[in-house]
């Protein structure tokens, strides 16, 4: 049999085919809302009747008549009495009531016995235990469909924890599909029933304490509004809660003056606002409301009125199609007889085939008389009213408009003031020096303050900084509660936690985190043992005092041995005048006691000496000493570089394993921080041993703040376990601190938010934008670089300062002073022991100083001699020099009036020059020598040989 499809605007000619009453088609409507200022059901039925009767397509003169009966209360007796009044009128269908479940059940039973169609417009009750009559059709969406739609929304939002508030116990049966989904999954659904007082406040407090963010409310419109009012009083209507209403009159609730704009309130609607008659229908109800109920603003057409409107059209459409196949008629029925309507079954079959578009969307029924193939619109409350963000279709399931939902979330941050909980921690958040003179956010500075300014500029929100009360980041207590900033986020007392808050799995279970804005790890901070301060004589440090003493003894021993060996060996004795060719009886030894002491010094200083060893024995002593000094000097140079160019750090531990394997150095971390949680939950053996030590150590090795830990490191034998970022910050400002080993783990800092925060994605995108623009790195350099200590990565050799090698300058200055003093003593000693004194000692010293200052010629005649030289014998006439004499060195001596020195030199040269071809000055004895031919005993010819021919004094 083909499906029946008819538009509402077409009225066929079936109205003329009514047997018993050819001029009317009678329908009965039972209303349980007699008040004019209520749902407008009476008006909606009248509008449907008038619209059908005025349709130009209607053929014939038959018209639709709707008899309205009122129920004063939900009573089975009164309902049965009303039905007994309806049956004799010969109706083709009974509509309603909309809110009387007991009466609706009696009507269904009576209509089923008489085979008269019955249209329900109220939510179904006791679906599992109530027998559905064949003659009963329900235009209201089933609770099963609503249950599946709610489950789809929870899946879309990845909600794993929710709470269901039930106004009646039947809701557990009505929402069976929803409950079954939570039973087969690991998600948690808590159910709370309203008590007889109908006060939802205790239930809401329990939900708040349980930290449940998603609340499903299954109640009528009035109770749903009451629950929302109480939630607002408890501060539970905020951006961290999501409310889902199962009542289909969600769009009729007034919430603009009730809730925060950021709250996520979702509900369903079945109204088809695109229908051609919907605007006229709503305006008519609004006009009637204004005339009779002007004390309360009109919120919109009630669902029951729209369903009754569609029910009238569904009955008319089915009767039209039935009249095309057979002539039907109606006749009066009685409650006292067993007579039934003979065309009732046929009409029911045609009603199940009806397909039309009504005020509540697509109207179609399945074999059970339930509505099918329709869609529920999913609405979300915004500051501008309700907006559709998706729909749930019976056949197609859930389809959400992610773009609309995301854009709405972004709008929630605009011009919104967020409460930021934080903690005083350098350099993340610090009080300004003049914070007493300021108020609000201006009192603070630091990395987090600058980052908040950047985020607020991108996302266009306002914020208020508030310090956490207990001054900790957050750890779980034995009773399951959390302390610190994490606890404030869980209690919804703050919107953001911006600090050095580490992202951990344990915290992620109770709060949400943004993407990390900084990456770090746990490190070890320890004090640097610099040893004693380098002194002026630190150049002596490469050798121990014992080595220096043995070197001095070795020097004295070598000097004595050299002096002794040089005296014993005959090869160190030689003539001071080699020109005498053996005629001189005087022998000289160059290794006097002074020279023996000086020779090792020259070798030790690697400067050499004018004294050259002649004998094999002295050369042996010299070679051994030079080998000794080579090793000593090389070792000294190597150690000097290590001692003076690099300040060695005396650190007794080099890794975390060294720290765990000893007990002399105490170590700990911040109490209640992520580092403490890391060691507490670690399964690594070394970290477990460290946790056992820290947990059992008395007095406690845990500190309350980073500043306390730094002070403990500097003032005691203590190693502090903290994040690498803080380690770097304090090492930049105190050169006595150093990092031991590498990182123990890898983690990140993130912005904390309450679970289910609707703007987490927006903060994620903003943080990524700051990272791409390098703004976070710029802020880190701004607040981390202290500039007091050099970078540890710079391993270039450090230049030596006066504090390192100043002692050698002291030794040099002292040596120069001693040398000057000794020179003066020698000068005075010579003057005092000279036999002839021409001037005083002071005058002589002044003269010498003047010649030194004026840089005069260093060659001058001796002013003082130890003894008066004897007079020279007169030179014979034949040996007197000629007027001009030429020396072999090219110097000329004039014949006329020469000075005495030149005349004497010329005379001596003339004596030597007799019988010689050349003369010269001996380079050793500084006396004149002549080149004279002498017969050689080995050869017959003559040989030339230099021979000293005079005993004259050496030239000056």
From Swiss-Prot:
Instruction: State the residue spans of region: Disordered.
Output: 863-889, 931-956
Q: Where is the signal peptide?
A: 1-20
- Kindly list the positions annotated as binding L-glutamate: 500, 502, 507, 674-675, 723
Identify the residue ranges that face the Extracellular compartment according to the record: 21-545, 645-804
Biased composition of type Basic and acidic residues is found at 939-948
- List, in alphabetical order, the Gene Ontology terms for molecular function in this entry: kainate selective glutamate receptor activity; ligand-gated monoatomic ion channel activity involved in regulation of presynaptic membrane potential; transmitter-gated monoatomic ion channel activity involved in regulation of postsynaptic membrane potential
Q: Which GO terms describe its cellular component?
A: cell projection; hippocampal mossy fiber to CA3 synapse; kainate selective glutamate receptor complex; plasma membrane; postsynaptic density membrane; presynaptic membrane
- Can you tell me which family this protein belongs to? Belongs to the glutamate-gated ion channel (TC 1.A.10.1) family. GRIK4 subfamily.
Q: How does it assemble?
A: Homodimer. Can form functional heteromeric receptors with GRIK1, GRIK2 and GRIK3.
Entry function: Ionotropic glutamate receptor that functions as a cation-permeable ligand-gated ion channel. Cannot form functional channels on its own. Shows channel activity only in heteromeric assembly with GRIK1, GRIK2 and GRIK3 subunits.
- Name under which the protein is recorded: Glutamate receptor ionotropic, kainate 4
Q: Which organism is the protein's source?
A: Homo sapiens
């Amino acid at each position: 049999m083909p499906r029946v499809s008819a538009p509402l605007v077409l009225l066929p000619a079936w109205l003329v085919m009514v047997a018993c009453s050819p001029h009317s088609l009678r329908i009965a409507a039972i209303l349980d809302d007699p008040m004019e200022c209520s749902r407008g059901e009476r008006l909606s039925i009248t509008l449907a009747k008038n619209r059908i009767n005025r349709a130009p397509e209607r053929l014939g003169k038959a018209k639709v008549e709707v008899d309205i009966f009122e129920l004063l209360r939900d009573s089975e007796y009164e309902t049965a009495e009303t039905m007994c009044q309806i049956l004799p009128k010969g109706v083709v269908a009974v509509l309603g009531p909309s809110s009387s479940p007991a009466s609706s059940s009696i009507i269904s039973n009576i209509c089923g016995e008489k085979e008269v169609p019955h249209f329900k417009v109220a939510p179904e009750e006791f679906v599992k235990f109530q027998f559905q009559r064949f003659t009963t059709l329900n235009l209201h969406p089933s609770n099963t469909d609503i249950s599946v739609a709610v489950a789809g929304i929870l899946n879309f939002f990845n909600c794993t924890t929710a709470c269901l508030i039930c106004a009646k116990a039947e809701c557990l049966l009505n929402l069976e599909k929803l409950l079954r989904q939570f039973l087969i999954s690991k998600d948690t659904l808590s159910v709370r029933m309203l008590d007889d007082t109908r006060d939802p406040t205790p239930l809401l407090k329990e939900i708040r304490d349980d930290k449940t963010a998603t609340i499903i409310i299954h109640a009528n419109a009035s109770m749903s509004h009451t629950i929302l009012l109480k939630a607002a009083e408890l501060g539970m209507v905020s951006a961290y809660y999501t409310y889902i209403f199962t009542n289909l009159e969600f769009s009729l609730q007034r919430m603009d003056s009730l809730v925060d704009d950021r709250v996520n309130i979702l509900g369903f609607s079945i109204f088809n606002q695109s229908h051609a008659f919907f605007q006229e229908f709503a305006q008519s109800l609004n006009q009637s409301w204004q005339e009779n109920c002007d004390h309360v603003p009109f919120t919109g057409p009630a669902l029951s009125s729209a369903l009754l409107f569609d029910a009238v059209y569904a009955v008319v459409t089915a009767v039209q199609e039935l009249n095309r196949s057979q002539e039907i008629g109606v006749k009066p029925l009685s409650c006292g007889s067993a007579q039934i309507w003979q065309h009732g079954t046929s009409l029911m079959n045609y009603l199940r085939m009806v397909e039309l578009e009504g005020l509540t969307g697509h109207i179609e029924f399945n074999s059970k008389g339930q509505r099918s193939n329709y869609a529920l619109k999913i609405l979300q409350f915004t500051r501008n009213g309700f907006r559709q963000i998706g729909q749930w279709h019976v056949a197609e399931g859930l389809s959400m408009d992610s773009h609309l939902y995301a854009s709405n979330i972004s709008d929630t941050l605009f011009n919104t003031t967020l409460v930021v909980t934080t903690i005083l921690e350098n350099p993340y958040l610090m009080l300004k020096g003049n914070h007493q003179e300021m108020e609000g956010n201006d009192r603070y500075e630091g990395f987090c303050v600058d980052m908040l300014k950047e985020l607020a500029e991108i996302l266009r929100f306002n914020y208020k900084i508030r310090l956490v009360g207990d001054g900790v980041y957050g750890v779980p207590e034995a009773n399951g509660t959390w302390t610190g900033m994490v606890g404030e986020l869980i209690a919804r007392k703050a919107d953001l936690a911006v600090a050095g808050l580490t992202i951990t799995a344990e915290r992620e279970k109770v709060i949400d985190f943004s993407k990390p804005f900084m990456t770090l790890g746990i490190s070890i901070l320890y004090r640097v043992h610099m040893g004693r301060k380098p002194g002026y004589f630190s150049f002596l440090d490469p050798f121990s005092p014992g080595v220096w003493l043995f070197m001095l003894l070795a020097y004295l021993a070598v000097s004595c041995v050299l002096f002794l060996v040089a005296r014993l060996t005959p090869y160190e004795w030689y003539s001071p005048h080699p020109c005498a060719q053996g005629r001189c009886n005087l022998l000289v030894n160059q290794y006097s006691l002074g020279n023996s002491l000086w020779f090792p010094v020259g070798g030790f200083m690697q400067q050499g000496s004018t004294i050259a060893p002649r004998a094999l024995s002295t050369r042996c002593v010299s070679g051994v000493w030079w080998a000794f000094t080579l090793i000593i000097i090389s070792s000294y140079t190597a150690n000097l570089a290590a001692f003076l160019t690099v300040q060695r750090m005396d650190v007794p531990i080099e890794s975390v394993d060294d720290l765990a394997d000893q007990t002399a150095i105490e170590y700990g971390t911040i109490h209640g921080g992520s580092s403490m949680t890391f060691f507490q939950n670690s399964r690594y053996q070394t970290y477990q041993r460290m946790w056992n030590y820290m947990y059992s150590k008395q007095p406690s090795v845990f500190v309350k703040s980073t500043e306390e830990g730094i002070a403990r490191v500097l003032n005691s034998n203590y190693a502090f376990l903290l994040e690498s970022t803080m380690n770097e910050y304090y090492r930049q400002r105190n050169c006595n601190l150093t990092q031991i080993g590498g990182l123990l783990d890898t983690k990140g800092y993130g912005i904390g938010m309450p679970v289910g925060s609707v703007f987490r994605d927006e903060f994620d995108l903003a943080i990524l934008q700051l990272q791409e623009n390098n703004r976070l790195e710029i802020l880190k350099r701004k607040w981390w670089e202290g500039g007091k200590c050099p970078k540890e990565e710079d391993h270039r050799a450090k230049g030596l300062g006066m504090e390192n090698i100043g002692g050698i300058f002291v030794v040099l200055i002292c040596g120069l002073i001693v040398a000057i003093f000794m020179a003066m003593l020698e000068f005075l000693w010579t003057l005092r022991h000279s036999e002839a004194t021409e001037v005083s000692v002071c005058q002589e010293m002044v003269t010498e100083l003047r010649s030194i200052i004026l840089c005069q010629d260093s060659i001058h005649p001796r002013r003082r001699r130890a003894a008066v030289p004897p007079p020279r014998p007169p030179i014979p006439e034949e040996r007197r020099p000629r007027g001009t004499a030429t020396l072999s060195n090219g110097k000329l001596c004039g014949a006329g009036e020469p000075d005495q020195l030149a005349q004497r030199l010329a005379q001596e040269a003339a004596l030597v020059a007799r019988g010689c071809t050349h003369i010269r000055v001996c380079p050793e004895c500084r006396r004149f020598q002549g080149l004279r031919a002498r017969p050689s005993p080995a050869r017959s010819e003559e040989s030339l040989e230099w021979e000293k021919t005079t005993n004259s004094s050496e030239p000056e």
